[in-house]
């Protein structure tokens, strides 16, 4: 799942480019614990390695996030998905889509890639069981043809897993 669900590629605005360059420099100087940015020449798509926190169900497990930035970032949220294989988690679908409010309705331009990563690691760390969402099969089937998770009407109802 390297590019499925990728938003249409429009050139980043000057504001988005400046913001991402600033975030990348900050990341290089002070990376969030448990994450590694895989260096590429593409500012519009970041691949980030996630390492499960010690003492959690995901301790030492390694996953990859793909972060695709829209033309008008940070006014518009990035698309964030797990690449295959996605972690088994009640809010992470087998196609890598993540049910997390800050990626959609609760997005704020004050958020950064680092704050997204910390929220995802917190979500993983607080999980009490490794399992797929109950509607995983139906959701994934309905996401054929590379539909973006940003096109989904998410229902954020359960923050205790």
Swiss-Prot record:
GO biological process: protein ubiquitination
Keyword Transit peptide among record annotations: no
Broad EC category: transferase
Domain UBC core: 15-161
Pfam families (UniProt xref): UQ_con
Alphabetized SMART domains for the sequence: UBCc (SM00212)
EC number, as in UniProt: 2.3.2.23
Reactions catalysed, as given in the entry: S-ubiquitinyl-[E1 ubiquitin-activating enzyme]-L-cysteine + [E2 ubiquitin-conjugating enzyme]-L-cysteine = [E1 ubiquitin-activating enzyme]-L-cysteine + S-ubiquitinyl-[E2 ubiquitin-conjugating enzyme]-L-cysteine
Pathway per the UniProt entry: Protein modification; protein ubiquitination
Assigned keywords, A-Z: ATP-binding, Nucleotide-binding, Transferase, Ubl conjugation pathway
Coiled coil: none
Active-site residues, as the UniProt record annotates them: 99
Keyword rRNA processing: no
UniProt-recorded Gene Ontology molecular function terms: ATP binding; ubiquitin conjugating enzyme activity
Matching PANTHER family: UBIQUITIN-CONJUGATING ENZYME E2 (PTHR24067)
Known role: Accepts the ubiquitin from the E1 complex and catalyzes its covalent attachment to other proteins.
Record-stated family: Belongs to the ubiquitin-conjugating enzyme family.
Protein's name in the database: Probable ubiquitin-conjugating enzyme E2 16
Organism lineage: Eukaryota, Viridiplantae, Streptophyta, Embryophyta, Tracheophyta
């Amino acid at each position: 799942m390297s590019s499925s669900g990728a938003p249409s590629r429009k050139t980043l605005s000057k504001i988005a480019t400046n913001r991402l360059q600033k975030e990348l420099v900050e990341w290089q100087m002070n990376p969030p614990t448990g994450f590694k940015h895989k260096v590429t020449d593409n500012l519009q798509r970041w691949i980030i390695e996630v390492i499960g926190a010690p003492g959690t169900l995901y301790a030492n497990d390694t996953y990859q996030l793909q972060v695709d930035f829209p033309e008008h970032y940070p006014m518009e949220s990035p698309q964030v998905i797990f690449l295959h294989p996605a972690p088994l988690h009640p809010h992470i679908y087998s196609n890598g889509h993540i049910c997390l409010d800050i990626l959609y309705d609760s997005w704020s331009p004050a958020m950064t890639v680092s704050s997204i990563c910390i929220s995802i690691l917190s979500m993983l760390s607080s999980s009490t069981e490794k399992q797929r969402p109950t509607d995983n099969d139906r959701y994934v089937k309905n996401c054929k043809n590379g539909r973006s998770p940003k096109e989904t009407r998410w229902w954020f109802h359960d923050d205790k897993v």
